[in-house]
């Protein structure tokens, strides 16, 4: 473990430079926005009614929980963040937020997210939120990320749980429907993350994070991306076959899945500048957003009232 952690010099911390924007960046707003959206869709698809105010509290708690995990992740990864071009402008690395302050912010934010989820929503949703934060920090960030080539696969559990939390916030249950939502994100995560690793391979090698391209090579990684893309295509159609979404969902999600497979296949003909990997990565974000937008707009049941 110690060989993977390199000392960094953040310089003198100037608290006067810290802004609200820095604290928002500390919570990984791009990741958090997707978490909020998938969590909301999970709530919408639950075949029960909930007061909009309670639904709003649940969404805020999910957002704060995701933000707390992101902040603690940045605290723990501040050494490797300073080595990667993609992460060198994060608040702790830039020296505008002190590392201990970031940790405290993350812990306090996470505590209130879990507490108010339990107080205002239900205990199951609160437990799932707590488990998600714990899993992302302890299982993925601390244990797997710097040790295992399967870091993204196993660690993807935490990123796939927000719709399950949202569903539980309304229904107080875990169902087949919410499990399928989980599977869609869980299977989507590896090809999405490995595409990023393909064009950030040098960064991951430099900070000794064992991402698949750095350990197994690009050809092996592309084969794995294609396998997971095929699995994703199959799983993404399941909401129609269990009656959760209508025929429009089946058609459009099928088309989106075919395009996903096309981009996965195009990786085998990529250029040295990783142009296809970048395109696949960008499309994968669009794909997940649009799939969940479809899940929301073509569902066969209504909930929040």
Swiss-Prot record:
Topology in membrane: Multi-pass membrane protein
GO MF annotation terms: protoheme IX farnesyltransferase activity
UniProt keywords, alphabetically: Cell inner membrane, Cell membrane, Heme biosynthesis, Membrane, Transferase, Transmembrane, Transmembrane helix
Catalytic function, reaction form: heme b + (2E,6E)-farnesyl diphosphate + H2O = Fe(II)-heme o + diphosphate
TM helices/strands, residue ranges: 31-51, 52-72, 96-118, 122-144, 151-171, 180-200, 225-245, 247-267, 281-301
The protein's Enzyme Commission number: 2.5.1.141
Xref: CDD domains: PT_UbiA_Cox10 (cd13957)
PROSITE patterns: UBIA
Transcription regulation as UniProt keyword: no
Protein role: Converts heme B (protoheme IX) to heme O by substitution of the vinyl group on carbon 2 of heme B porphyrin ring with a hydroxyethyl farnesyl side group.
The name this protein goes by in its record: Protoheme IX farnesyltransferase
Source organism (scientific name): Rickettsia peacockii (strain Rustic)
Gene name for this UniProt entry: ctaB
